[in-house]
Amino acid sequence: MKVVLGVINVSDRASEGLYEDTPGKACVALLREWLTTPFEAAYAVVPDVQAKIEAELKRMADEAGCCLIVTTGGTGPAPRDVTPEATAAVCGQMLPGFGEAMRAASLKIVPTAILSRQTAGIRGHTLIVNLPGRPKSIKENLAAVFPAIPYCIDLIGGPRLETNGATMPVFRPKAEPS
């Protein structure tokens, strides 16, 4: 089974070419560092427009066949930060524990983490996770929840993702003997 992971950088300025897309590239680099499972990266940069974010999430989940989509940016309280709303609009189930865990981890580093509205949800066989827009924050937040991501993808019928245990251990419950 071909594994496709999606990364969407939500940024007005990056989508207009006004600055280099470092958040999205940082996210792909982290996934390549942590995963030993070969994967193809689906990639997009979209403006902070809810309809465009929703359309790209649907395209990656439904057409590109991504088992995991991570978004970067658009998770704060500013009026144009609508990534969580777009995620909720396209998901059948929400996983609020992801946002709670990321905020808890970030609060140990910076008090403004409480302003983050990032979340996660499931669309079909795809897990969608919102991340902040700064590369340092992306790593800190993704590290807080990544140990649960491969098992979540197992549970929703996606491919088995294996990681480099030295750089990113994951948790999968052991099967109980029959």
Model-flagged regions — what are they?
Residues 1-178:
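Non-catalytic beta/alpha edge segments that cap or flank active sites
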